[in-house]
């Protein structure tokens, strides 16, 4: 019997979109590719709202990937990092993981030497965003963070819009 091979279309940077498909917290991860008329390519995963690769021409016109990242969603999950991610609820460090709101002290998770860094150990960089591909150059990602998410107060809806222009700007 013959085995049929399934052809996989790789991105310009050599990424296999299949390697970015998995389920995290009951949500499906994907790789999205934006391309412009100039040939530039930006690859984004909805896991953490991350830019995974950016292919741009160097001074000699040779396309080069200028992003430090991984080749699969498994690496982003198993080797925790903030590479290319959208950070939230808070970017940077909150001293001792404590905030005061209306006179009440709120203790946030401490994930960085006794401090809360980039929204805590389950920050937005480790969550799956809802994706809305608008056209070949535009992707909108949405993250809904309910009250109490990592002990942060209030409901937050965050939208990240990635737009690749024909003059190679994002």
Language model segments and positions:
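Surface-exposed acidic/polar loop and edge beta-strand patches at domain peripheries
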Residues: 3-170
